[in-house]
């Protein structure tokens, strides 16, 4: 499943995939794979991404329940 919330949060901060990757010490390809839903990041990486974007884990990585 694509992670459009991550892509949207990254765009809202005006960061490229490479810039976000540099902030969290991973490759641009890793960020791309997470956004495409091809890679499930570790909890440590999820936390790093959230800190870089100023978001919560819930906001970026957990689907809303109805």
Predicted segments with their positions:
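Short, charged recognition helix plus adjacent turn
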Residues: 12, 51, 61-66
């Amino acid at each position: 499943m694509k992670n459009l919330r991550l892509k949207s949060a990254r765009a809202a901060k005006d960061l490229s995939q490479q810039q976000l990757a540099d902030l969290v010490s991973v490759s641009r390809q890793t960020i791309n794979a997470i956004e495409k839903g091809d890679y499930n990041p570790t909890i440590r990486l999820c936390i790093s991404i959230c800190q870089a974007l100023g978001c919560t884990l819930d906001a970026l990585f957990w689907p809303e329940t109805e």
